[in-house]
Amino acid sequence: MRYNNFHVNALCSPTRAALLSGRNAHEIGFGTITEGANREPGYTSIWPKNAVSIAEVLKRNGYSTAAFGKWHNTPTWEVNPAGPFTHWPTSLGFEYFYGFLGAATTQYDPALFQNTTPVELPKTPEQGYRLNPDLVDHAEQWVHQHDASAPDRKGVS
């Protein structure tokens, strides 16, 4: 894939939306971070149905897809275990998601989701839990499971 007119924004949500869609962030409703969304065109933080994500394109072409870590492209009213899950990573082409949905989280007691299910952390900070190694471990596990279960299928995470 080649981006020939890509630019980063001063904010994470717009940059991520542009990177995942190949479009200008305002064109797909991400002119600001999700917490700053409003009804103005280009600022809704609602991924339009006509904007296909790179994950969807890859999945349609035989790739397995997963996202790990910070997402921050789900409207704030959807960020809860009850959903709706219309704008979560698993609704935008990613077959698997392990990470957090907000702008930031703590390294020691993060609010994580596996797909759309809240995650109970395997240990406390006092027992040595840290977010970054946990994300790496889950990404590695996904790659190894993918390789073992579908060795002929391509994967992207």
Model-derived features with residue positions:
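Formylglycine-dependent sulfatase
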Residues: M1-S157
